[in-house]
């Protein structure tokens, strides 16, 4: 269902919304991609470690429950960030997060972790002053949001 058989032929429509935020990453961009009417996918581009637009270290973040790893890899290759994080909510305190470079599925990424929890916070999925857990290839790690 989410599989792209011919990524070279995929046509994407982009719309961007810019919003300032006042946490680890001050600026983010939110895009929506539509692939030939089959899949609408929203993702964030969050600049970690900065308080200025287009500064810091950018990471892509996708919050989606139903993406397979083949699609995640192709998407990361398409958007070409050093890392793109794909988040699946397990329950209110636990998240499965997969990190992809344009060429590989990797164990962990620091700036993409910060970007992931910023996206979760901005989307209302998590709250300030709480501890959450993320399952990654590197194991299950605690993340404090405050």
Model-derived regions: residue spans:
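Polybasic, lysine-rich low-complexity intrinsically disordered segments
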Residues: 2-4, 14
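Aromatic (phenylalanine/tyrosine) cluster motif
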Residues: 12, 18, 24-33
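N-terminal, positively charged, Ser/Thr/Ala/Gly-biased leader segments
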Residues: 33-54
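Short beta-strand-to-turn element immediately C-terminal to the catalytic PLP-Schiff-base lysine
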Residues: 61-64, 87-88
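Short, conserved charged micro-motifs
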Residues: 67-73, 108
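Anion-binding (especially nucleotide phosphate/pyrophosphate-binding) glycine-rich loop
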Residues: 74-106
């Amino acid at each position: 269902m989410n599989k792209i058989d011919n990524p070279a032929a995929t046509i994407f429509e982009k719309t961007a919304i810019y919003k300032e935020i006042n946490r680890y990453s001050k600026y983010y961009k939110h895009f929506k991609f539509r692939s030939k009417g089959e899949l609408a996918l929203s993702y964030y581009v969050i600049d970690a470690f900065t308080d200025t637009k287009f500064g810091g270290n950018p990471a892509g973040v996708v919050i989606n429950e139903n993406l397979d790893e083949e699609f995640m890899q192709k998407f990361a290759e398409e958007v070409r960030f050093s890392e793109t994080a794909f988040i699946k909510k397990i329950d209110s305190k636990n998240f499965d997060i997969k990190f992809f470079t344009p060429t590989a599925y990797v164990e962990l990424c620091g700036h993409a972790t910060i970007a992931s929890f910023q996206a979760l916070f901005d989307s209302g999925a998590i709250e300030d002053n709480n501890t959450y857990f993320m399952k990654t290839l590197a194991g299950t790690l605690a993340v404090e949001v405050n």
